[in-house]
Amino acid sequence: MNFLILFCVVASASVVYSSISDQCLRCICEVESGCRAIGCHWDVYSNSCGYFQIKQGYWTDCGSPGHSMESCADNYNCASGCVRSYMDHYIKYNGCADTCESYARMHNGGPNGCKSSHHHATDNYWRLVQAKGCS
C-alpha cells in the first residue's frame, strides 16, 4: 500500500515541460526587433528593451539576469536566456499547451496571455509570429 501511494506521488510529479524551441524564440525576436539590439524605448507605460522588447517586470520574473535590464536585453544570450526562464516558469502554472503559439501569446500578453480567454488580446501578435515562419 505504501509503495502504491509513493508511486502515485512520484508519477504525478513527473510531468515534463520542454522549453521554447530555438525556432520559436527566433520568430519572437524577429517580430520584436528584427532580432537586433535596439536599446530601449517607451512603450505603453514603461520602457521596452532589446532583442525581445523586455520590460522591467518581465526581467524581474525571469530572475533579473545580467547587470541590468537594459544591458541584458541588448545581449542576445542574456535576453534569450531571460525569455526561456520566463517561459519555463509560467508554462507549467497556467495550463497552456507547450507550443510556440502559447509561448508567443505569453510573451506578448503576460503569464495568462496563452489562455483562450485572453486570445483576443494576442491574436494580432500571434499572426505576426506565424508570418515569420512559426506555427
Curated annotation (Swiss-Prot):
Top-rank taxon, per record: Eukaryota
EC numbers: 3.2.1.17
Keyword vocabulary terms for this entry: Antibiotic, Antimicrobial, Bacteriolytic enzyme, Disulfide bond, Glycosidase, Hydrolase, Secreted, Signal
Localization in the cell: Secreted
Signal peptide: 1-18
Ranges of residues in domain I-type lysozyme: 19-135
GO cellular-component term (any): extracellular region
Catalytic reaction equation(s): Hydrolysis of (1->4)-beta-linkages between N-acetylmuramic acid and N-acetyl-D-glucosamine residues in a peptidoglycan and between N-acetyl-D-glucosamine residues in chitodextrins
Function: The main role of this lysozyme is in digestion. Has antibacterial activity against the Gram-positive bacterium P.cerevisiae and the Gram-negative bacteria E.coli and V.vulnificus. Shows some chitinase activity but no isopeptidase activity.
Protein name (record): Lysozyme 2
Organism, as annotated: Crassostrea virginica (Eastern oyster)
